[in-house]
Curated annotation (Swiss-Prot):
Residues 1-60, 120-159, 234-286, 356-367 are cytoplasmic. The gene is Or85e. Residues 82-98, 181-212, 308-334, 389-467 are extracellular. This is Putative odorant receptor 85e. The keyword Coiled coil does not apply. Odorant receptor which mediates acceptance or avoidance behavior, depending on its substrates. The odorant receptor repertoire encodes a large collection of odor stimuli that vary widely in identity, intensity, and duration. May form a complex with Orco to form odorant-sensing units, providing sensitive and prolonged odorant signaling and calcium permeability. It comes from Drosophila melanogaster. Keywords: Cell membrane, Membrane, Olfaction, Receptor, Sensory transduction, Transducer, Transmembrane, Transmembrane helix. Its main location: membrane. GO terms for biological process: detection of chemical stimulus involved in sensory perception of smell; sensory perception of smell; signal transduction. It comes from the Eukaryota. It is a multi-pass membrane protein. It is found in: Cell membrane. The atypical heteromeric and topological design of the odorant receptors appears to be an insect-specific solution for odor recognition, making the OR/Orco complex an attractive target for the development of highly selective insect repellents to disrupt olfactory-mediated host-seeking behaviors of insect disease vectors. Odor-evoked OR currents are independent of known G-protein-coupled second messenger pathways. The keyword Signal does not apply.
Length: 467
């Protein structure tokens, strides 16, 4: 947590503006924690306080059983589609092969994602709790401020939209036989028994529909978690930028500067739209502080100590961001490696099936949904990684925007160390092999279309041999 001086020596819960600076959120990840429980990646959840003591064992066993059921559903469908792929390989029917292979990749990755986040659930929970405890909900007390609530709101809205999009794509495929009124399964795979029989059809259909829902939940959870953490960290970078810009204003505010003098400084820092420097912040918007609210309870310490202490608070915030960024890399590096491979092959196969497959309307719609979700998912990971890399080295630029030279003799050694550390770029990698940025986006798409060209040549040769 930040010191009381960070908030103007008034109150840690003070709001710099009643309407533009919302109260601090106690839990930034409430929605994601619910999703984590729903998609079976939280085998050991904390039981609520109202949970009866006599049912404590049931509360511990049920999540583990549910996680096991989700993993078994995904992996057994992956095995069945593997058998289907092996059965259609001798036929040489590329469309049938790519169909089965696509679903094999999807279900094995769903199983991998579920197992991965189950194993990382404790570490992920500790990470979320650390961010909830240490994040700054607004910038250093000064004449202007930014509120990180906007980043939280963006991440929450994105999570809702992305999860709904993923579920819509997979459920529409899963319920298509019901919509058409035909007795068939949504997933055409091998079974060692008659899956359409009167005693098994309902159970098999329910299992496949549940598996489809888990595909959407697993894909949606991984992407929304990464984007949420990225947006929150970018919001913290914006809080740091505004805090560094207001170091001199913060010192004057605590030093007893008159409201008129602070208002003049506010106009100087918060220029109009025509004169304001563009792209100072990634996500957040800068607002004028309600100076009367902050001036009412301020103290008047030595200005040199106030400036130095404020810089120390900014350094602590910067270290917190770098620590969280490193933990983000540790959590997602293995996941992004497998995700990159999965997206590469899946993108290639989906495009090939879309180009060379049958022209059934429902099939085309489902393929376009999967293709759109796959491309957008790749864009999410690479674009957020690019934003983190680019904006993690802009802290020094934000420092130069304030009147730092007036207090340079108080911070000689500290500022040199800070400026050196401010050039440490944040990178999210795929297994330490590739950086997840726009270059990776281009390379994945290039690789996918290279495989697509190879498949099209194989299909053309097969057609020529048949003629």
């Amino acid at each position: 947590m930040a010191s009381l001086q960070f908030h103007g020596n008034v109150d840690a819960d003070i709001r710099y503006d009643i309407s533009l600076d919302p109260a601090r959120e106690s839990n930034l990840f409430r929605l994601l924690m619910g999703l984590q429980l729903a998609n079976g990646t939280k085998p050991s959840p904390r039981l609520p306080k109202w949970w009866p003591k006599r049912l404590e064992m049931i509360g511990k066993v049920l999540p583990k059983a549910y996680c096991s059921m989700v993993i078994f559903t995904s992996l057994h469908l992956g095995v069945l589609f593997t058998k289907t792929t092996l059965d259609v390989l001798p036929t040489g029917e590329l469309q049938a092969i790519t169909d089965a292979l696509t679903m094999t990749i999807i279900y094995f990755f769903t199983g991998y994602g579920t197992i991965y986040w189950c194993l990382r659930s404790r570490r992920l929970l500790a990470y979320m709790e650390h961010m909830n405890r240490e994040y700054r909900h607004h910038s250093l007390a000064g004449v202007t401020f930014v509120s990180s609530h906007a980043a939280f709101r963006m991440s929450r809205n994105f999570t809702v939209v992305w999860i709904m999009s993923c579920l819509l794509g997979v459920i529409s495929w899963g319920v298509s036989p019901l919509m058409l009124g035909i007795r068939m399964l949504p997933l055409q795979c091998w079974y060692p028994f008659d899956a359409l029989g009167p005693g098994t059809y309902t159970a098999v259909y329910a299992t496949q529909l549940f598996g489809q829902i888990m595909v959407g939940m697993t894909f949606g959870f991984g992407g929304s978690l990464f984007v949420t953490l990225s947006l929150l960290l970018l919001g913290q970078f914006d809080v740091l930028y505004c805090s560094l810009k207001n170091l001199d204003a913060h010192t004057k505010l605590l030093g007893g500067e008159s409201v008129n003098g602070l208002s003049s400084l506010q106009e100087e820092l918060l220029l109009g739209d025509s004169k304001r420097e563009l792209n100072q912040y990634v996500l957040l918007q800068e607002h004028p502080t309600d100076l009367l609210r902050l001036s009412a309870g301020r103290k008047c310490p030595d200005q040199g100590n106030a400036f130095h202490n404020a810089l120390v608070e900014c350094i602590r915030l910067h270290r917190f961001i770098l620590h969280c960024s490193q933990e983000l890399e540790n959590l997602f590096s293995p996941y992004c490696l497998v995700k990159s491979l999965q997206i590469t092959f899946q993108l290639c196969l989906l495009v090939f099936v879309g180009v060379s497959g049958t022209r059934e309307v429902l099939r085309i719609v489902n393929q376009l949904q999967y293709l759109g979700l796959t491309i957008f998912e790749l864009l999410m990971f690479t674009y957020c990684g690019e934003l983190l890399s680019r904006h993690s080295i802009r802290s020094g630029d934000a420092f130069w925007r304030g009147a730092w030279w007036k207090h340079a003799h108080f911070i000689r050694q500290d500022i040199l160390i800070f400026l050196v550390n401010s050039r440490r770029a944040v990178h999210v990698t795929a297994g330490k092999f590739y950086v997840m940025d726009v270059n990776r986006l281009r390379s994945v798409i290039t690789q996918a279309f290279s495989f697509l060209t190879l498949l099209q040549k194989l299909a053309a040769k097969k057609t020529e041999s048949e003629l």
